[in-house]
Structures are given as C-alpha cells and as structure tokens.
C-alpha cells in the first residue's frame, strides 16, 4: 500500500521549499531519545563503573577504536564526541521504524525511521563532508589543504573534486537505501498479516520475525559503516598527506 507524506511548503523569495513533517518529527524524536539515553546512562558516575556506565564506556572505547584505526589520536581525539553522538543518533534513527509505523486513515505516514528519507541521510552526509573540509583547512592551512587536490600531479584535481560529490552521495544513499528497503518489506509482510486470511498469517509471522532481526542487524551495521567512513574521510583531510 502506498503511503503519503505530510508535506508543507514555504515560499521563500519566490521559491517553494517543501518540508516533510513526519521526517522533522522523527528527527526530533531521535534527538530526544539520544539526549535521554545520555542523561540516564551518565547519572551517578562512579570510579568503578557498573551497568549503564559500563555500556557508555564501551561505546566510547568502541568509537575511539574506529578513530584510532584511521588517524592518530592526537588529531582524531577532537572528533570523539562527534562520532559517539553520530553513531548513537544513526543507530536509534535506524531502529525507530522497525517495531511499528503510524499511518492515518488517509494513508499519511507519520512514524518511520528518519533515515528512511533520502533528504535526511543526504543532509547528514553533506554535513559530514563539509566538516571534513572545515577541519582540513583549520588544521593544515588553506595552502596545504588545496595542495592535496593536485598531488601527486595536477590533472588529478578534477578527479579529486568529483570524488567529493560521489563520497557525499554514496555515504548518504547507502544508509537510505538499506533502511528504506527494510521498512518497505516489513510493510508488505505486515499488510499480508492484516489483510489476508489464515494462510497469510502462516507466511507473514515467521517472515516478520526473521526480517525484524535482520533489519536490526542491518541498522546496526549501517550506523557503524557511516561512522567508519566519516572518520576515513576526516582522516584524509586532516592528515599531513592524503
């Protein structure tokens, strides 16, 4: 079944800018859940960590390992909180659309994973790529940063510039494609469960269980891949040579 998106447009200087209200809602829900998780897990910190504090420290150590695998900690340490926030945000965003969806009578979809929207994932990837340029210039200086585009010889500049666009697209669309495809199949299986007779239940229930588990795995892996590639791109820009 096709679902509609709750769209609103805003005219700015003669141009219509369209907003997807469900995506905005889910972005805010995800941000709130990340904030809530951080508050809950960091209350009453102790020198000897237990329970929730162990979980938080494991996340920080795991992300530190990703950063150190791509650049020296002396340079990469400043991106630690950024990477931790990103991996938590993307993981939670990937999970939100799995247990259920909220659809109104007119087939308007309100509850979904925000990462099932290409606009959201491409905005995330664009932000990351822009940050790599910002820190590349800040840490290496404009001259050294620009020299990286013409090394080892200047004709590569065209390829290097083109690579920036392809990196942005692949980083965002990979995340979107995997999450969107997973939710589409879950919707089809759920439709089979609710709309077909008993034989539909026999097929859909095992399928839903298996695909839910697989979608959790895919959502986790995609969060990891996004952070890994983000740190790879960052290391290419802040390294003395790339």
Swiss-Prot record:
Its main location: membrane. The keyword Isomerase does not apply. The chain crosses the membrane at residues 21-41, 83-103, 117-137, 175-195, 198-218. Gene3D superfamilies: ATP synthase, F0 complex, subunit A. CDD domains: ATP-synt_Fo_a_6. It is found in: Cell membrane; Membrane raft. It is a multi-pass membrane protein. InterPro entries: ATP_syn_F0_a_bact/chloroplast, ATP_synth_F0_asu, ATP_synth_F0_asu_AS, F0_ATP_A_sf. Keywords: ATP synthesis, Cell membrane, CF(0), Hydrogen ion transport, Ion transport, Membrane, Transmembrane, Transmembrane helix, Transport. The keyword Transmembrane helix applies. Belongs to the ATPase A chain family. F-type ATPases have 2 components, CF(1) - the catalytic core - and CF(0) - the membrane proton channel. CF(1) has five subunits: alpha(3), beta(3), gamma(1), delta(1), epsilon(1). CF(0) has three main subunits: a(1), b(2) and c(9-12). The alpha and beta chains form an alternating ring which encloses part of the gamma chain. CF(1) is attached to CF(0) by a central stalk formed by the gamma and epsilon chains, while a peripheral stalk is formed by the delta and b chains. This is ATP synthase subunit a. The lineage of its organism: Bacteria, Bacillati, Bacillota, Bacilli, Bacillales.
């Amino acid at each position: 079944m096709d679902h509609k998106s709750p769209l609103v447009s805003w005219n700015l200087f003669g141009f219509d800018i369209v907003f997807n209200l469900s995506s905005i809602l889910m972005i805010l829900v995800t941000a709130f859940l990340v904030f809530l998780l951080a508050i809950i897990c960091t209350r009453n910190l102790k020198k000897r960590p237990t329970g929730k504090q162990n979980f938080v420290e494991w996340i920080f150590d795991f992300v530190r390992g990703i950063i150190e695998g791509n650049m020296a900690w002396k340079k990469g340490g400043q991106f630690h909180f950024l990477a931790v926030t990103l991996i938590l945000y993307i993981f939670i965003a990937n999970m939100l659309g799995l247990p259920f969806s909220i659809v109104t009578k007119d087939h308007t979809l309100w509850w979904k994973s925000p990462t099932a929207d290409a606009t959201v994932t491409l905005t995330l990837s664009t932000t990351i790529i822009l940050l790599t340029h910002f820190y590349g210039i800040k840490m290496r200086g404009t001259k050294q940063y620009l020299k990286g585009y013409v090394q080892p010889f200047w004709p590569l500049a065209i390829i290097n510039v083109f690579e920036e666009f392809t990196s942005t697209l692949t980083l965002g669309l990979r995340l979107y494609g995997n999450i969107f495809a997973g939710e589409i199949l879950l919707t089809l299986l759920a439709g089979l469960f609710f709309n077909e007779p008993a034989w539909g239940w026999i097929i859909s229930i095992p399928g839903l269980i298996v695909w839910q588990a697989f979608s959790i795995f895919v959502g986790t892996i995609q969060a990891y891949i996004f952070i890994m590639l983000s740190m790879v791109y960052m290391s290419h820009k802040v390294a003395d040579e790339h």
